[in-house]
Amino acid sequence: MVTGVQTCALPILRRDFPEHFTLFQALPGVEARLSFEALITWQSTLMYRLRQVRRLLPFSPLLAGDRGWFELLPASGWSYHEELNYYEDLPVFYPATRINFNCTSQQMKGAVNQRVFDVPACGGFLLTDYRRQLENLFEPGREVICYHEEGEIPELVRHYLSRDAERERIAAAGILLLLCHTFAVYL
């Protein structure tokens, strides 16, 4: 479930896995406990993102990034592009892609990640998981599209793949990000 309201790992560990929480408490020192919590957060992010990406497979997505996808997904139903350079490749890639899909790291809780700014700023269309902070930065539904529940992903993808003009209008509205979200505005 995607609610935009995430909690840190420890309350969940205490509530749902008390035997593991006891082991966590027995770890020697703060460093070991922080490392354990980071591991849980990274693993939960991997599991979360993998669930979301699997919902895209009926649409034969292009996945860009490291080769780890080959270990996690079936061999067919998607294509691969190696990692893209942030400064040189992504500003060209984002607007050339019909739907840029984002699922935020679990460590972000209610905050958005950099992709939520980058895709609209480059003139790309963004489908992202809802986070509370989004409403302070964008007008969801006008500048970016959000899914609140995992089950919404296939229908939203189907909808926007079949409506070029609507998708392009939303992407164009997102470009206003360049005018509204600058260092001068926030300083």
What are these regions (language model features)?
Residues 2, 63, 172:
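Short glycine/serine/threonine-biased micro-segments
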Residues 4, 43, 47, 81-84:
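Conserved phosphate-coordination/catalytic loops
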Residues 67-187:
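Catalytic binding pocket for nucleotide-activated donors in carbohydrate/polymer assembly enzymes
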Residues 12-58, 64:
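Alpha-helix-centered segments that form part of catalytic cores
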Residues 1-8:
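Single conserved hydrophobic/aromatic residue that forms the stacking wall/gate
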Residues 59-60, 98:
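Loop/turn elements at helix/coil->beta-strand transitions in domains of secreted/extracellular proteins
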